[in-house]
Amino acid sequence: MGQYYKPCQIENKKAIEWIYSHDVQSKWTRDDGKVFMMGEGLKLMEHSYVRNKLMQCVEKLLIPGGDWYKKPIVWAGDYAAPEEGSEDNLFSMSDEERTEGERISFKIQSPKALTLAQSSKYKFVVNHTTKQYVDKSKSPERDGYQIHPLSLLTAEGNGQGGGDFRGRDSKGLIGSWARNIISMEKEIPTGYKELIFNLKE
């Protein structure tokens, strides 16, 4: 079965805020030329691309002044392991069906995205925990698409469901930045080292 994901901002091993990808509506064109609106996909490789609107929504939260700027981030999969001492993983913690007294986290209503022009300026995904950065513009291109490093680097649960990344990951990049302090920047912070992100399917 397919594994669904939610980008989450976490604190003390709990999801504080999250985005539901179906809430991010994009215009699509059918083969007959008719335009329609549809939410972005829930599976990891349905939305993990540069210029994808869900990715641009998370980028907007991670730029200077954004609500998630320099905060710990996880792309939480629903098949990921539960948190220590809990039956819930971060995906199930971010559940709006919980009653108010049980609620741990809150869904961001009507998430806003960077424009394509703005997104292209914030090309550095920065990890302030490891003092590393990735230049998303260098992500390998295939059939006109580039995988966005942010979601794969912070993913938990990959490889356990349909729609997960199935390409080669010889350096163990996937999930290596999960729960780290992340931001999107226009410039490389002084003293930070580049991490080469070369994953492709």
Cite the ranges covered by each PLM segment.
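Low-complexity intrinsically disordered segments
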Residues: 33-201
